[in-house]
Amino acid sequence: MDNSVIVSLRDIVVEFDGQRILDGLNLDIHDKEFVTLLGSSGCGKTTTLRLIAGFLEPNSGKVLLKGQDITGVPPYKRPVNTVFQKYALFPHLNVFENVAFGLRLKKLDEDTIRRKVRDMLEVVGLKGFERRSISQMSGGQQQRVAIARSLVNEPEILLLDEPLGALDLKLRKEMQLELKRLQREMNITFIYVTHDQEEALTMSDTVVVMNGGKVQQIGTPEDIYNEPKNAFVADFIGDSNIVDGVMHRDFLVSFSGVEFPCVDRGFAREESVQVVVRPEDIEVVSPVEGQLVGVVNDVIFKGVHFEMHVECEGREWLIHSTRACTPGETIGMRIGPNEIHIMSRSEG
């Protein structure tokens, strides 16, 4: 994978009606990666996408493309195409003409247009649909047409603004894999916006977690999930148990009144820390085998596991386990060294 930086945002500030949407944002996006901007509504992720597309100019700061300042360059002069949640397809044009639209604006000859459109429809799995009316296409097929229309122009960067939001769950999961396949096959940069954590973890090479107009953490899906930088990321990416603890020395932490071996180091002796434990990383055992002992408050069957809320040492723990327990049952809880993640309280 090419590791060169294709897009850089430098000290970006965006304000709407006196409200700061992006607050000194700095971000590098690497070429030929699938990068996801992840965050809740209002975090600034779509504003960031619009800046890259050229639909919006910052109040201050710069947008760089391969080191060149493109802050004031209009969208049609940028090597960028955008796919929106509302696909904005032309209902009066068939599939072929929708995909060919941008090529016709470039005044390419008919043979070239025909070849490029047919090649692209084959890539997105719509070969043979050239003359189909848009109104006869399913939601997933319409999305493929929108993607084909963007990719046929051979952009260096494809921007995707929550394009799966209108699809049902099964189709959304299928399209997640399809988008990742397309990105690898086309070998270009995809920048994807979503609030869906699972979507981000499934598709991305790099995840950018945003909150309050700032980047909270950048990393691989594995890093973001297993090594959250702060309490916001730990809580936003999947379910987490976040408890106060004390780091006695390297590889030894205490929380909930019990000392636990861990794999973390580099903290001050007796430093107050926050401890993150994922629900699936807690082993349910008998009370005599448990490092912690708690009482099950409630149990919900989730299909692949049981979700339990367990009262222990004055706080409620969330546990995902394949073992079925009953409300009121006393259980033991074991947490291995590799399942404990330590964060400085200043990071939380």
PLM regions: where:
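ABC ATPase nucleotide-binding domains
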Residues: 34, 75-85, 89-232
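The feature captures the beta-strand-to-loop junction immediately N-terminal to the Walker
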Residues: 38-40
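Conserved coupling/switch loops of ABC nucleotide-binding domains, chiefly the family-specific signature
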Residues: 59-62, 112, 212, 244
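Helix-to-loop junction immediately C-terminal to a conserved catalytic motif
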Residues: 53
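Conserved ABC transporter NBD signature motif
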Residues: 61-69
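ABC-family P-loop ATPase nucleotide-binding domain
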Residues: 1-13, 287-289, 346-348
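Non-catalytic connector elements of ABC transporters
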Residues: 240, 251-348
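Conserved structural motif at the start of ABC-family nucleotide-binding domains
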Residues: 7, 22-24
